[in-house]
Amino acid sequence: MAKQASESNRAFGVHSEVGQLRKVMVCSPGRAHQRLTPSNCDTLLFDDVLWVENAKRDHFDFVQKMRDRGVDVVEMHNLLTETVAIPEGRKWILDNQVVPDQVGLGLVDELRGYLESLTPRDLAETLIGGVSTHDFPDAHGGEMLKLVREAAGMTEYLLPPLPNTLYTRDTTCWIYGGVTLNSLYWPARHEEPILATAIYKFHPDFAGKVNVWWGDPTRDHGLATLEGGDVMPIGKGNVLIGLSERTSRQAISQVAAALFKKKAAERVIVAAMPKLRAAMHLDTVFTFADRDCVLLYPDIVNNIAAFSYRPADNSAGLELRKDEKPFVDVVAEALGLKKLRVVETGGNAYMRERTQWDSGANLVCASPGVVFAYDRNTYTNTLLRKEGIEVITIVGAELGRGRGGGHCMTCPITRDAVDY
């Protein structure tokens, strides 16, 4: 208990990719994943339906293995339950989610009344799991509900399910001493930042203790989209951000300017990547395994062009220059290292592509040289072990069906710096 109290009082902040992981937020599989069907999983950004019971078991195993390594793991359903138990928190979420553009003008009051009647736990489950017209009680619906059911069927959603909350990395990201509240690319994920932001604003563990560098989920950011899988605070004032399928140059420039204005970072290294589903974020092709060791998918990373933002005395507050060195060398130089040890996702071209599809490069560090990785990527895990990395395996058969691994499934809230 004394240790838990000490961890809860520690200042929030993520100061490296490999320092001791102290506190992390996850979101367990649940009702939202039971909504996945062969006809809707593509729209909801999953490649297949999940065996939900097994996904829950495997996620619990991952959480327990992190706790065994001293990590304080907090779960989003639980945090949201405690947040909506606070009247101001519940009101803020419903004010921003139960709106005419989402629900339809004729059902706003009815849906709001139904949600207000739920217990905090049921409301949290519903906000993540969604509300279909089939779920919605006839007593609350009236003629508009009959119209919606007649026109769209019983699987029409008044609030959409959010199965991608499983990948907590993307919705918000902690960069040194503060956090960004991200604007996500695909419509299937647009509601997620509201829930995470409410936790930071109203939950007693976070309220009044969070520095927000950038982002406001209550407004439309247009083309400025940012997802946490592209963001890595690697240390020494440097931040890596992937310019990818889901993170735009508009957002990167705004985040860089905000960080520089608040003296939260000294350099933002932009990794210009191809826009591919199999390489949707930087962390799907490049992650750290130790203070001086990275795992990468060479077919993509060897073709990344690096650009660097630095503070400048101009109207934008920043300047951008192309880095002439290869991307990995740019990262090493930024950390003051002569070079990084590089482990490539291995095998022939077929194995490399399969490993990439199975999130083989998506490691998350518990501490320097200790990583969590999917068990199925046996060849790459063996290469890591030969390099002296301790690989703790987690089962990825179900959890990876949305194309994310351990790095994607964790939102670090507190992580130690590394002495470079």
Curated annotation (Swiss-Prot):
Its EC number is 3.5.3.6. It is found in: Cytoplasm. It catalyses: L-arginine + H2O = L-citrulline + NH4(+). It comes from the Bacteria. Its main location: cytoplasm. The keyword Hydrolase applies. It is an enzyme of class 3 (hydrolase). One of its GO terms (biological process) is arginine catabolic process to ornithine. Pathway: Amino-acid degradation; L-arginine degradation via ADI pathway; carbamoyl phosphate from L-arginine: step 1/2. This is Arginine deiminase. It comes from Bradyrhizobium diazoefficiens (strain JCM 10833 / BCRC 13528 / IAM 13628 / NBRC 14792 / USDA 110). The gene is arcA.
